[in-house]
């Protein structure tokens, strides 16, 4: 455990600035220069346990090539036997999420200024062949002067990760900010999906609320596929047009970065960011990722990739456990995804219920199943409801709810449904 006053190389560690599932960030001082930094401390054992070495390496490699005033800088990476230390630019103004929650929406003038900086940073990334894939308010920090700094590139992709069809194929991001083509689990253009996320951020900046939101994840996804969020009357026509063009559900007709920069609303009082893009020498130790060979050889297509439904990411701001498959089997309500067609999925669920001896009541995409059992010692059984929510033709959510009954039987039922009908990557992750 790191204690206050401990040193890592020339850095003296101080208070904790933030903490996530697999890392914590501490304030640090360079004892030679007095300069302030933020050091992200990652336990190697945690990397091994969660199989996220690929993502952390990707974050480091991505930050190495980015040098822009609106992007958090990586200064160096150090390692001990048990930890990795990423020495980052210290940004003291908190994140945009906290700013909106505490003070509400921004004026259109303030919001446009921040949005211009966001687009400058994202445009720079895209020109470098880097696509963030997890842009959200929590990943936009504010410095002491109110300038934005984009952070958390753990889900980012470089242009060489595109397949032969020229598209990315890994579902990444946070549900409220994810583009419809990403949720559809098909190939997508990284630049277009980032633009969608920027559109969501612009909407929140100017309205103080999310464009696509609901307590039910399936409903959120339906709203995203439909697009066309309600825009308050106080939003100017120029801003309204910009939002609608960025939140176009069709990635082909969605506005590009060039189109955004050419828009009159964006150009108003716009001053492009100045930056020096000369190459720097980064101190990246060769032994930072010395792990067992099988860890290094893990395929990027394995469940180590974090997506919108398997979020084990570096941030604690978003926890999907209340929505999705990380819920404990003992809990009354469990959800998982399936790539089967909704009609086939419902028929297969009905078959499994029947084979396990349940009596069924069926209504639309909802099944109520009851099983009564008696033993010498007690009367037992199980009453459950299963419902299918269609998010897209190739992606459905199954929700299983226990009304009452035997927890062990409920677990058997859930595990069979998941094994036979769930997405294969989820089966490996959940039943490990």
UniProtKB/Swiss-Prot annotation:
Residues 331-360 are annotated as: PPI. Residues 152-181 are annotated as: Activation loop. The modification Phosphoserine is found at residue 156. GO terms for molecular function: ATP binding; protein serine kinase activity; protein serine/threonine kinase activity. ATP binds at residues 17-25, 40. InterPro entries: Kinase-like_dom_sf (IPR011009), NAF/FISL_domain (IPR018451), NAF_dom (IPR004041), Prot_kinase_dom (IPR000719), Protein_kinase_ATP_BS (IPR017441), Ser/Thr_kinase_AS (IPR008271). Residues 301-325 form the NAF domain. Keywords: ATP-binding, Kinase, Manganese, Nucleotide-binding, Phosphoprotein, Serine/threonine-protein kinase, Transferase. GO terms for biological process: signal transduction. It is an enzyme of class 2 (transferase). It catalyses: L-seryl-[protein] + ATP = O-phospho-L-seryl-[protein] + ADP + H(+); L-threonyl-[protein] + ATP = O-phospho-L-threonyl-[protein] + ADP + H(+). Its EC number is 2.7.11.1. The active site is at 134 (proton acceptor). Residues 11-266 form the Protein kinase domain. The activation loop within the kinase domain is the target of phosphorylation/activation by upstream protein kinases. The PPI motif mediates the interaction with the ABI (abscisic acid-insensitive) phosphatases. Interacts with CBL1. Belongs to the protein kinase superfamily. CAMK Ser/Thr protein kinase family. SNF1 subfamily. This is CBL-interacting serine/threonine-protein kinase 17. The lineage of its organism: Eukaryota, Viridiplantae, Streptophyta, Embryophyta, Tracheophyta. The gene is CIPK17.
